[in-house]
Amino acid sequence: MPPNLTGYYRFVSQKNMEDYLQALNISLAVRKIALLLKPDKEIEHQGNHMTVRTLSTFRNYTVQFDVGVEFEEDLRSVDGRKCQTIVTWEEEHLVCVQKGEVPNRGWRHWLEGEMLYLELTARDAVCEQVFRKVR
């Protein structure tokens, strides 16, 4: 049975964010702002339905989905694109594949104790973020 990811998580650290943003062709100005951010994550997980909110002082992003059901994801507020997205469980990892202009794009969430890990991929870039559960 997959873990329940419901909770509010505070940013702890990240690695390789600039390479990830470059792989998405994000402008230099926006990359510089993004590298200063320490986003929080809020996840609501009820059965197969999930809402994931990324909250920061610059921009917030919310995605809602049903696990295993493909949907069109509007990422215009993130990088100006739309893509076809599907999120599935691979054992205890929540795995997202985003099909569109950028190859090998997606993310993976998993828990280790009170820590939430997020691995973001685009092209050959991999960014790792770590969050701590606060409630």
UniProtKB/Swiss-Prot annotation:
GO terms for biological process: fatty acid transport. GO terms for molecular function: fatty acid binding; retinal binding; retinoid binding; retinol binding. Keywords: Cytoplasm, Retinol-binding, Transport, Vitamin A. Higher expression in adult kidney and liver and to a lesser extent in adult and fetal spleen, adult lymph nodes and appendix, and fetal liver and kidney. Strongly decreased in hepatocellular carcinoma tissues (at protein level). It is found in: Cytoplasm. InterPro entries: Calycin (IPR012674), Fatty_acid-bd (IPR000463), ILBP (IPR031259), Lipocln_cytosolic_FA-bd_dom (IPR000566). GO terms for cellular component: cytosol; extracellular exosome; nucleus. Transmembrane segments: none annotated. The keyword Transport applies. Pfam families: Lipocalin. Belongs to the calycin superfamily. Fatty-acid binding protein (FABP) family. Forms a beta-barrel structure that accommodates hydrophobic ligands in its interior. Intracellular transport of retinol. This is Retinol-binding protein 5. It comes from Homo sapiens.
